[in-house]
């Protein structure tokens, strides 16, 4: 048994001075493995008298447990020290500034649409929407556009068949609203529209916002005041606004709206073609025929309507000279609007 005590003391000393988990495993194999020192002692039990074997066997088991406990404790200690060292090496200085993350932003046309909606919502207008695939009636007939009108030509309109087409304006939303509710009506209708046109200032798909107000006693003076206040709120400037007589089948009288050039302040430049004025929208009093076709009495109610291209206003607000830039998905361009 003195030999057993010496083996245990030797094993515990080795465990105590080990600084490596791998070396610790070698110690375990040396003392507790299949051919280990303590395992060999256990095999000598057969040489002892039968009455001594239980007592000696118990002592050997206690010795093995003592060594195993020491091994486990030292292993936990070494692993904890290794983890602490690794954490110290990988420590993050939380006082350092974080790395900036590239974030997206709203498209300039989306910004413009939301800005227009906000301007009109402040004065009681609601946002109305409708289908982009329209029927001929709501896109043309109900808006007093007869069959021989040039807008119905194939080179101006995308047709699916004789009756279905991609809407050429958001005016059908106004018609559907008048069909479903009686005055007073006060709405703006933003959305995508489609026309067979593509160049520096035109796109086959673009965004339009139209507005409609129908009530009793509505006059052109109300239309004029509404548009003037909207344009000044949108551009955040006191702009000169002028109305030029024009023609639209669904309004009478009709007008084109020009503003003083926001680039040169009316002095004349390339953008305004030296005129000092920029065309921004069309408008007019709702034609009595349009009201009748929507079951609204034109003798009792009057209304005005207006329409503008969102890309056109975005170009003027942000100083963009090519409409196609809005649809190129070039991050160098779009990143300027975050």
UniProtKB/Swiss-Prot annotation:
Which superkingdom does the taxonomy of this entry point to? Bacteria
Q: What PROSITE patterns is this protein classified in?
A: AA_TRNA_LIGASE_II
Q: Which GO terms describe its cellular component?
A: cytoplasm
Which cofactors are reported in the record for this sequence?
A: Mg(2+)
CDD domains the UniProt entry points to: PheRS_alpha_core
Q: Provide the residue positions that the database annotates as binding Mg(2+).
A: 252
Instruction: Give the co-factor note.
Output: Binds 2 magnesium ions per tetramer.
Q: Which UniProt keywords apply?
A: Aminoacyl-tRNA synthetase, ATP-binding, Cytoplasm, Ligase, Magnesium, Metal-binding, Nucleotide-binding, Protein biosynthesis
The family database entries (Gene3D superfamilies) matched by this protein are listed as: Bira Bifunctional Protein, Domain 2 (3.30.930.10)
- Molecular function terms, GO-annotated: ATP binding; magnesium ion binding; phenylalanine-tRNA ligase activity; tRNA binding
Q: Which Enzyme Commission number(s) are on file for it?
A: 6.1.1.20
The entry's family comment says:
Belongs to the class-II aminoacyl-tRNA synthetase family. Phe-tRNA synthetase alpha subunit type 1 subfamily.
Name this protein carries in UniProt: Phenylalanine--tRNA ligase alpha subunit
Biological source species: Pseudomonas aeruginosa (strain LESB58)
Question: Upper lineage ranks?
Answer: Bacteria, Pseudomonadati, Pseudomonadota, Gammaproteobacteria, Pseudomonadales
Q: Which gene encodes it?
A: pheS
